[in-house]
Amino acid sequence: MDLGLKGKRAIVTGATRGIGRAIAETLADEGCHVGICARDPVSVEATIASLAGKGVTATGRALDVRDGAALKGWIAAAADALGGLDILVSNVSAMAGASGDEAWRRNFETDLMGAVHAVEAAVPLLEKSGAAAIVQIASIAAIEVGHDVFPDGYLQVYGAFKAALTNYIAELARTLGPKGIRANTVSPGQIYFPGGVWHRREQEGNPMHRKALARIRLGRFGRPEDVARAVAFLASPAASFVSGANLVIDGAFTRRVN
């Protein structure tokens, strides 16, 4: 299927590794021009080079999304470099701790306000698109609690903010729909990639790795590409009547009826 993404202009936050990198690469493979950001300047430059090697326009900047002014300024600059904006993918996450004031603060500033500031900067640009889409990366931690893979309370901070984001995007779908902007959430389950959290748990012999794998009904961890393909679909004209959805990608790990 041709998703109709060729020539579209996309911004992806937190896009130099894991899910974010796979999203940026997949969008570029589909012919999108792509802007990316992350904190590490070396990784940003390497990702830009990889994307540009696919024959599309690629731009990026090293920044911390907790700096709302810097994030908004970069989104405006990136859209200018790309010739406009059709797609915003908000992916960055702090993954900061299980509890404590600092964990709450970092997740609030990074996950929640990072997304809010990105949307605020992007919406005036997306209104000019005619086929605009926002895709927020959340987590199954937002939709299910109390299973036996993690200790009680382990995901309370992370899950709380991912749930807030899911609600935020659902509200955006309603408020931005009349402006021609769709908004959807993707909630991944356990995604494995080198250097990622599930790779580290495997290397450490953490029992959470074994327990999670045993509960995934498809018998394997997800890959970043599994998430990226779903994001590409939701961002594309092929999903032109999909808005306000939360697409769970977890290999039937969760037992919740969506």
Regions found by a protein language model. Give the residues of each.
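A glycine/serine/threonine-rich, flexible loop-to-helix segment
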Residues: 1, 49, 53, 149-151, ...
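Conserved glycine-rich cofactor-binding loop
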Residues: 16-17
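Catalytic loop of short-chain dehydrogenase/reductase
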Residues: 95-98, 135-164, 169-178, 190
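Substrate-binding pocket helix/loop in short-chain dehydrogenase/reductase
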Residues: 96-108, 154, 212
